[in-house]
Amino acid sequence: MTRSVDIKNREREILGLIIDSYIEESKPISSAYICQKYHLACSTATIRNIMVLLEKQGFLSHLYTSSGRVPTQEGFRCYVENCDRQNDSQEYSISLDSYASSQPSIEDVISHTLDALVQLSGYTSLMAVSGRDEKIFFRGMRFMLEQPEFEDVRRLKDIFYTLEVKMGALQNLFFDSIDDGIRILIGDDIGFEEIADCSLVISGLRDKDLSFAFALLGPMRMNYNKATSSLQSVRNRLKETVEEFI
């Protein structure tokens, strides 16, 4: 159960700015950085005091090798669930015109959906389709290599282990999440120890006897606005395709 509902408006605002900066910079964020970047009408001491409060509430962690702070899992949950995020309502333009040339197979749908998700989001894309045993299709693992969180090759091994050995359980998680619209799972919420330092953003749709579930996997420091907008755009385009051809 998250405690983020107790956070005050000013603290929520500063937490959002800290996490926005951390997503962009991938390094501890200081009070001076926040004041300078966002031209806030308050002193660095005021921001520092708020950061101390956020740390006491469990939303930030202080790295003693740095004067800055980084978000905790609880901080990211608050950011996603309660912070006033800028609503990115713009739908990304998706070209899936290859569907229109002829009736696509399920394999075509899977391939083009994964390609579109990778292209739009820049994150590793996963997909499951009902009736395809317990298989998880994925694309874009190279994007994991670009994230500093996964410089340790052992972390990538853990991810591959989950995708290959725990496909059935992962597929169940995907299909259970379809009716939620877009579901964001952060860290331990995913339920798999091997990827407990990641985030998973899931969407999908059901049509007649078929269920399509797709997701984006990345570090907790992922761009959630971009991830959710990418999934929504792909879901809308896939829905049109399914209704017309499948």
Task: List where the protein language model places each region.
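Short alpha-helical segments that sit at the start of domains
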Residues: 1-16
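N-terminal helix-turn-helix
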Residues: 17-20, 24, 28-82
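Conserved phosphate/pyrophosphate-binding and hydrolysis machinery centered on Walker-type P-loop NTPases
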Residues: 4, 8, 28, 69, ...
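Intrinsically disordered, acidic Ser/Thr/Pro-rich low-complexity regulatory segments
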Residues: 77, 84-246
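Contiguous, well-ordered alpha-helical segments that form the cores/surfaces of helical PPI scaffolds
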Residues: 15-20, 199-202
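Alpha-helical promoter-recognition and RNA polymerase-docking modules of transcription initiation factors
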Residues: 2-5, 38-40, 232, 244
